[in-house]
Amino acid sequence: MSRIFLQGLLVFTVCLVLSSAGRTTEITEFRVVSPGEVEITFTSDAGVLYDVLGSEDLRNFSVLTRVSGSGDRTRVAVQVPVGQTERRFFRIRTPQLPPTPEWFRSYGGSGEESHGHYILACEDGGVLQVGETGFLPNTRILAIKLDQEGRLEWRQEYSNRTTGASGHGTYNLGNSVLEVDEAYWIAGAINRNSAAIKVNKGTGEAELVKTHSNGGYDAYEHMVETDGGLVAVGYTNAEDRENTFFAEGRGYLAFLDPEGNKTGGRSLRDDLAQAYRIAKHEQALIVSGLVWNEDDNLDFGLLKLNADGSRVWGRLFGGARDDHCFGMDLGADGSIFLTGHTLSGTINWQTYTMKLDHDGILQWERKRGNPRGFDPRFIHDEAWGVRATPDGGCILTAGTGDEYGSYSETIGSHVSDQWEVYVIKYGPEGGLEWEATYEAEEGDWAGEDLALTRDGGVIIAVDSSQFGFLKLPSF
């Protein structure tokens, strides 16, 4: 009893000292329910959102859950790792919305410009971004790893030379990265062929480089780890080789062993022109991407496959004009979130986001854009990445700006010609919780991807003509 009482007293003190960042609240009761669960009661207001944060060292707090106040006292059960209840600290706060950036870092490669496509929040607390440096066709894959404070840990480039060839080759593409126990796997292309590159976690040095000629100009876009190795998706027979986002090819899926050797594959061309993302849910594979419809416009495409790649079902989403699907993530309950941008039912390109259940049945869809209030005829809002959030909603990133020489407008400190990072947070039922834009002191920014960090915040991959890293705190 004395140990539990002391822990409850310590939690109470921590709350009083550290809750000043949001609306102050007080933990009034604390109880260990079981070795892996605690119960916290705190002062609250009905209907107000509160974040319950936990820490092992009083330095780094992460969001454990978000609850709505039920009156002047709210009680919540919180899961904690078994064996850590004696050395676990808690605090309660109201969310700070929209969040103010903690830091921004920018790093480049050997090329004049560098463009990131994917960002990963790593198990060690750091972040890893991949993309290319240079301009097509003479690009090299670039990977940059930072620690949790934004300090550079390593930077590596990969090309045809990484395979042992004498030249760098062309059309080297870094499309995404996957973390496994002992390494990172980069999915992309080397010298016009699909590539899987296994790199050392500590240095980024390539340990294995596997290239597969799957047909014409081809590439892997994304990978997922399975019991038998890896499954990669991408495209073959690209018609637009100068486009790193949609190459107008044929969707493709490949099975790789743990060493990256291809053991099988199948075309997805009947369902997807380009397979862009893959995720695993139980024993099934969920694949998203872009598909041509009967009117020769693009729609969101979604597939559920068995573990052997056989088709379970396919879904199409979109309207009368182009709908470009680039981001996908799965919630803890198997819910599927898709994002991209659309011209269907909009004045110009706007973000297009939807939530589906695990059977691919639409739960809600939202179109949103022009957050700075310019003439919508000239504004592009282009979304590239989405992440499911613990509350059952999602957060996405985009770029917002205009590309028209005939139009330029200034509203306050915002200029339409200057692109900015655009972030949108939706709740479980699709309600807008907050949105924000983030701008450079000079030049353009655009959000390319994002990941949820271990402290409950977000890291955003920013196109700033280099690899930009924008860190937002817990939201």
List each language-model region with its residue ranges.
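Positively charged n-region of N-terminal signal peptides that target proteins for export
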Residues: 1-7
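Bacterial N-terminal signal peptides
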Residues: 8-19
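Compositionally biased, low-hydrophobicity segments enriched in charged and small polar residues
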Residues: 9-10, 23-33, 123, 390, ...
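Short, composition-biased motifs enriched in small/polar/acidic residues
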Residues: 20-98
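A sequence-level/structural motif corresponding to short, flexible coil/turn segments enriched
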Residues: 98-475
